[in-house]
Design a protein with these regions (language model features):
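Glycine- and small-hydrophobic-enriched helix-loop-helix hairpins
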Residues: 2, 118-122, 129-131
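N-terminal alpha-helical segment
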Residues: 9, 30, 46, 102-106
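Regular secondary-structure segments
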Residues: 1, 14, 48-51, 55, ...
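Short, non-transmembrane cytosolic segments of multipass membrane proteins
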Residues: 1-11, 24-29, 115-116
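Short helix-terminus and kink motifs of transmembrane alpha helices
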Residues: 7, 11, 82-90, 120, ...
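Membrane-cytosol interface motif
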Residues: 95-115, 120
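Helix-termination/interfacial motifs at the ends of transmembrane alpha-helices
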Residues: 16-95
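A short structural micro-motif
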Residues: 15-19, 112, 128-131
Length: 131
């Protein structure tokens, strides 16, 4: 705070919060991308498994088990996306929102102090973040 103008202080800290948020969202985007690619990789595994089944067309006894094994790759791909990757991405986004809100709360408090606002007013304004 140290004699800085409140508007300038808010501008600088808002830019810092934006950069902080963008950096944190990169990790979430990686998990989200993995959730998008995972089913595709599962389908590729299924196609490769079916190609392998085609090699055994002469033996009908092996067809059923071969097809079942081929589709396991699809189940793994869809399962990994919906049970692992996408929930991790959503959890990260929720945590990022909390961290950004904490920083915004800090900025409001610092700007209130820089403005010379009554401490009770600053406290009540910050309590609004917790409601």
């Amino acid at each position: 705070v140290d004699g800085a103008e409140p508007d300038r202080l808010r501008q600088v800290l808002d830019v810092e919060i934006g950069a902080y948020e963008a950096k944190l969202k990169l990790a979430s985007k990686i998990w989200e991308s993995a959730g998008g690619y995972s089913p595709t990789i599962g389908i590729i595994g299924a196609v490769m498994g079916l190609i392998h089944v085609m090699e055994n067309l002469a033996d009908p006894a092996k067809l059923g088990s071969g097809i079942a094994v081929a589709f396991v790759a699809t189940i793994y791909g869809v399962g990994a996306a919906n049970l692992i990757f996408l929930p991790i991405a959503k959890k990260l986004m929720a945590n990022i929102a909390i961290l950004v809100t904490q920083r915004e709360m800090l900025v409001d408090g610092l700007v209130g102090i820089a403005n010379g606002d009554n401490p009770r007013i600053v406290e009540s304004r910050l309590q609004g973040y917790l409601a």
